[in-house]
Each structure stands twice: as C-alpha cells, then as structure tokens.
Amino acid sequence: MASSTRLTIIQSSFVSARTRLNYVSKTNHSGFACRSLSKPRNLSLSVYSMGSSSSSPKPDNVQEAEKNEFASLSENEWKKRLTPEQYYITRQKGTERAFTGEYWNSKTPGVYNCVCCDTPLFDSSTKFDSGTGWPSYYQPIGNNVKTKLDLSIIFMPRQEVVCAVCNAHLGHVFDDGPRPTGKRYCLNSAALKLNALEKTRD
C-alpha cells in the first residue's frame, strides 16, 4: 500500500514538473523573437500585380547547382559581398534587435529574397503583424527555405530557418502563427532584400 502511494506521488510530481517546463518554454519567448501572439494582422491590403517567376520555388536541379556555387565561398568572400550586419546575421547566426530592422513593419507588396544569394523566400501576402518587432510570415515560397534544430539556448530547443540554397541564417519558426499554416517564420530584416512590386494600372 505504501509503495502504491509513493508511486502516485512520484507520477504527480513528474506531471507537475513537465507542466511547469512547458509554461516556462512558452512564457520565456519574448527575449528570443518568439513571444506568444495576439490576433495577427495581415499587412498586405492592396491588390498588386505579381509576375509568376518572381515568387516561384526554384527547381531542385537549379538549387543544387547554386548550392555548390555558394558552398565554395570562403568567409572572406562573404565579408566582401555583405555589410558587417548582414554577415553577422546570415553567416554567424546573429539576431538583430527587435523593432530596429528595415522590414519589421513594412507593408510594401513584393517578394522578400535572400540577401546573400537572391533566392525568393517569402511573399508579402504571407506577412503579418506578430507584435514581436521582427518581420513575420506564415508560409515560405515552395522549398526555398529549410529548417533545422537549434540547441544554442539550453533547455529551449528551437527550429532555425535557413536559405535552402546558400544556408544563410534567416531566423526561427514557431507554432503560434495564423491560419492556414499555424506557423510564424520570425526573421531578421538584415537577412532579407525586398523586391517591391508596382501597382496594377486600371
């Protein structure tokens, strides 16, 4: 009887500890570009023309060829191509301060490309106001981005978002975004380059 009581207490303690861990994981996000969100607001409100090629996923054979090209670049070559901030963010996995990036509050329609290799990554129609101070999107363009496990913060595993072509660090993705994907791709402005689109003429 005593053994059964001790087992019940141990099980209850384990469930309680796991609940506290989940709570901490959710509430400690604000300092790492991953604050819980209120109702997101889509930032693309006007109808604009869009060429199909500008926001299309790259074919696998094209991606592979470009991967080989960019994989051969040395760190010094990247430094020559990028500004110090761009290099820090994309090649050293840095994070810009919230509410300081060029695109965090941008409502300009267009396609956001990788600043390193010009691969189209996100369409402005998937951009929304996350309230975090970083540009946020709910869906990438095709397979032009990929994710991998980031264990750089102890007890807080995250999913890093990188360019599928040149492996540039873009930001992180979280499961608190809007419909239809429920994803929030929280990115650094310095990793992006906006190709703005012109209004459709009547």
UniProtKB/Swiss-Prot annotation:
GO cellular component terms given for this protein: chloroplast; chloroplast stroma
Residues that coordinate or bind Zn(2+): C114, C117, C163, C166
Catalysed transformations (reactions): L-methionyl-[protein] + [thioredoxin]-disulfide + H2O = L-methionyl-(R)-S-oxide-[protein] + [thioredoxin]-dithiol
One Pfam family linked to the record: SelR
Compartment annotation: Plastid, Chloroplast
Gene3D superfamilies linked: Peptide methionine sulfoxide reductase
Keywords for the protein's UniProt record, in alphabetical order: Chloroplast, Electron transport, Metal-binding, Oxidoreductase, Plastid, Redox-active center, Transit peptide, Transport, Zinc
Region (Disordered): 48-67
Single GO BP term: protein repair
Catalytic-site annotation from UniProt: C186
InterPro entries: Met_Sox_Rdtase_MsrB, Met_Sox_Rdtase_MsrB_dom, Mss4-like_sf
Result of changing T132S: Decreases activity 14-fold
Cofactor(s) named in the record: Zn(2+)
Main location: plastid
GO molecular function: metal ion binding; peptide-methionine (R)-S-oxide reductase activity
Phenotype for C116S: Decreases activity 2-fold
EC code(s) of this entry: 1.8.4.12
Family recorded in the similarity comment: Belongs to the MsrB Met sulfoxide reductase family.
Note: Lacks the conserved cysteine (here Thr-132) required for the reduction by thioredoxins (TRX) through a dithiol-disulfide exchange involving both redox-active Cys of TRX and MSRB. Reduced by thioredoxin CDSP32 which regenerates MSRB1 through the direct reduction of the sulfenic acid formed on the catalytic Cys, without the help of any other thiol compound. Also reduced by the glutahione/glutaredoxin (GSH/GRX) system via a glutathionylation step of the sulfenic acid and then by GRX reduction of the GSH-MSR adduct.
Protein name, as recorded: Peptide methionine sulfoxide reductase B1, chloroplastic
